[in-house]
Amino acid sequence: MRRYQFTSESVTEGHPDKVCDQISDAILDGILEKDPTARVACETLVKTGMAVVAGEITTSAWVDMPVVVRNTIKDIGYTDAAMGFDYETCAVLTAIEKQSPDISRGVTEGEGLFKEQGAGDQGLMFGYATDETSELMPSPISYAHRLARKLADLRKSKKLDWLRPDGKTQVTIEYEDQTPVRVSAVVVSTQHSPEVKHKTIVDAVRSLIIEKCIPAKLMDKSTKIYVNPTGRFVVGGPFGDAGLTGRKIIVDTYGGMGRHGGGAFSGKDPTKVDRSACYYARYVAKNVVASKLAARCEVQIAYAIGVAQPVGVHVNTFGTGRVGEDVLEKYIMQNFDMRPKAIIEQLDLLKPIYRKTAAYGHFGRDEFTWEKTDRAAKLAEDLLRPTLAAVPATTNGAGSKNGSGSKKEPKRKGKKETGAQA
């Protein structure tokens, strides 16, 4: 029996990097609404008094980018020049060119070396799922997102009118083997107006945010709670720190539990496998866990630019699988179509849905198509039949008696945590 800690963080929508993600995805949505086949790679930088939008966009649509930028900043909550950054007075600069024809020919059917629509770039993408929460996400990132969203809700409802848009949260969970047993530390840092006292902030965050978001049974006298541990957080947002699109990729995914291939999501249309293949890898991994074939599952997909079929698929069930990983890999490759065009069609990715993804995580939210578990029953039916379950595995030790190809499934204590969804 091993006890260990794991920590994940989240940020609010007013964090400067998240401001950029939301601007990039708001521009993407504005274009896709008028031209679903557009090619978009849109990056944003924000700093005091300015926002810069740059990238490569090929489209028949016209979008008033400065208006989209300002409306997004306004929606987030930067409405007062006293914060050092606001939607009315900030300058908006744009530097946009068309997509490179050398890239376009690999993504456009019939133009490259291969007939099919190929991947928009080479790269490796990961998807992950675990049964420790109802949304099949790791507990630390689920609770961190929940805290961050609660900060924004209380600010926007004006229940805590001294809150400002920038903020960060962090949760450390103590595990026994693979089961979360307690919260060992919580950190909440929130931007605030200058007149509010530190004790007022601490008391409100404890009672209205932490105690509302984290189950009491996971907290104890030894749980460490830190609220604005520097004692003051007035200067924040783009006034305090420069922001860039794509700098919160761990917040966007699994909080560090489950690997990341390095590609960011926001501002990219779904021909970019950095985005669409990560969504699909999550879809596959979540269906595996929902089918009870494994308690944890990580799926890696890798592509070559301009080529439709992935060059590699890898499945890891971390010793929790009920069938061998080689059996699972073979089944996934035969039954889940991972070509970029097929992913886009299966997950319905040409709609303007992306602004919503750009804060509080891309995964663990039922509103998105890649969170469906519509393949779980079929997976269980096909792979838990005795004839298939008996197939010897070779992935993590050939010829194991239980046919799992991995370590014996650990006993998981207690009921799994639920209600961690942001």
From Swiss-Prot:
Name the CDD domains on file: S-AdoMet_synt
Say if the entry is tagged with keyword Transferase.
yes
Query: What is any one of the record's Gene Ontology cellular component terms?
Result: cytoplasm
Which residues does Mg(2+) bind? Answer: D17
Q: What is its main location?
A: cytoplasm
Q: In which pathway does it act?
A: Amino-acid biosynthesis; S-adenosyl-L-methionine biosynthesis; S-adenosyl-L-methionine from L-methionine: step 1/1
Catalytically driven reaction(s): L-methionine + ATP + H2O = S-adenosyl-L-methionine + phosphate + diphosphate
Sequence positions that bind ATP: H15, D166, G167, K168, R232, F233, D241, R247, K248, A264, K268
Q: Which residues bind K(+)?
A: E43
Q: Which residues bind L-methionine?
A: E56, Q99, D241, K272
Molecular function (Gene Ontology), one example: magnesium ion binding
Signal peptide range: none
The yes or no answer to whether the keyword Magnesium is present is yes
Query: What keywords would UniProt list here?
Result: ATP-binding, Cytoplasm, Magnesium, Metal-binding, Nucleotide-binding, One-carbon metabolism, Potassium, Transferase
Q: What cofactor is this protein dependent on? A: Mg(2+); K(+)
Question: Where is the segment annotated Disordered?
Answer: 390-422
Q: Which PROSITE patterns does the record cross-reference, listed alphabetically?
A: ADOMET_SYNTHASE_1, ADOMET_SYNTHASE_2
Concerning Pfam families, the annotation shows: S-AdoMet_synt_C, S-AdoMet_synt_M, S-AdoMet_synt_N
**Which GO BP terms apply?**
one-carbon metabolic process; S-adenosylmethionine biosynthetic process
Q: Which HAMAP family match?
A: S_AdoMet_synth1
Q: Tell me its family.
A: Belongs to the AdoMet synthase family.
Q: How does it assemble?
A: Homotetramer; dimer of dimers.
NCBIfam families in the record: metK (TIGR01034)
Q: What name is this protein filed under?
A: S-adenosylmethionine synthase
| Naturally occurring in which organism (per UniProt) | Sorangium cellulosum (strain So ce56)
